[in-house]
Swiss-Prot record:
A non-essential component of RNA polymerase (RNAP). Belongs to the RNA polymerase subunit epsilon family. RNAP is composed of a core of 2 alpha, a beta and a beta' subunit. The core is associated with a delta subunit, and at least one of epsilon or omega. When a sigma factor is associated with the core the holoenzyme is formed, which can initiate transcription. Keywords: DNA-directed RNA polymerase, Nucleotidyltransferase, Transcription, Transferase. This is DNA-directed RNA polymerase subunit epsilon. It comes from Lactococcus lactis subsp. cremoris (strain MG1363). The gene is rpoY.
Length: 76
């Protein structure tokens, strides 16, 4: 299942929409809830990011993200 993570690189400042970045994770989970938990654990262990929101993507959403040219799976 593919997840899109919205985050701030600087976790010492209040989040601002203008500085929000996104990354994509491909996780082997059975449910969306398991994926959100696993994504938060991976990000906490491997980054200092301030995670704002995590959402699973449908196949159609993945295709749209690929068309925008910014789709790249992040691995830790």
């Amino acid at each position: 299942m593919i997840f899109k993570v919205f985050y701030q690189k600087d976790n010492t400042r209040s989040p601002r929409r203008e500085t929000t970045d996104a990354l994509y994770l491909d996780l082997d989970v059975a449910t969306k809830e398991e994926g959100v938990i696993l994504a938060r654990e991976l990000l906490a262990k491997n980054t200092a990011y301030h995670v704002e929101f995590i959402d699973s993507l449908s196949d159609e959403s993945v295709e749209y993200e690929k068309e925008t040219g910014v789709f790249e799976i992040t691995s830790f």
